[in-house]
């Protein structure tokens, strides 16, 4: 048994026993996103080496600490979301569907299906019907856009009228009829999907990446600054500034822990938030 596996087993044991402890799991290659399923399995997207094609993969950590590669033929996998026992992953300019049980992947939404060619597909979320919302960070300056991939296969650009506000959308979070957007430029927006309204609710998160939410509390990560924030009623509080590149965060199923992939450090940190 490797030292890495022993450390993961110890970490998961601490978590399962509700011991207040921050856990750091090492050994990933540019981890970008993370998500936990209802059974407690944790999935991590790993971009792999820079400028190397087809070395990206999805790794699963089960409750016993065993690591399994689900698929390993991706380019630069980033955002992850689970729906109907499948993983949906942004991978450069396509969205990939991953069959976890069979360990296979296929293109769910190809480049040519988008109304405008995507440049840098980044985060992804899903509604209760299976429609996917995907951010395209573009050139990280002013060409970003947000897509909806409907279950019918139709893809639309949404919030076209707000493109002067949306510079480089990164993190996405659906909460009922609200879509929250964290822009790379550091601004945090709330969009009403029914009223088609769009408003800024906070700013100052330079290199904004991931979003998580527990009741009225948001957790926001800054990739550029290596920071994790807590946001309540528009007021931000710094939780941790020790990361090298805090990427796409998520919550545990019980909403008591936040998972933070650190892309540059190659780690997954698990912090108690309750």
What name fits each language-model region?
Residues 17-21:
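Sec/Tat signal peptide C-region and signal peptidase I cleavage site
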Residues 246-274:
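Blade-level signature of beta-propeller repeat domains, shared across WD40, Kelch, NHL, RCC1
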Residues 7-16:
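Bacterial N-terminal signal peptides
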Residues 59, 96, 147, 189-190, ...:
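WD40 beta-propeller blade core
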Residues 61-65, 99-103, 149-154, 192-196, ...:
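Short loop/turn segments that connect beta-strands within beta-propeller blades
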Residues 48-52, 94-95, 138-142, 186-187, ...:
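Short glycine/acidic-enriched loop and turn motifs that connect beta-strands
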Residues 28-39, 45, 54-55, 71-88, ...:
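Beta-rich, blade/repeat-based domains predominating
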Residues 22-25, 65-71, 104-115, 154-162, ...:
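A short beta-strand motif characteristic of beta-propeller blades
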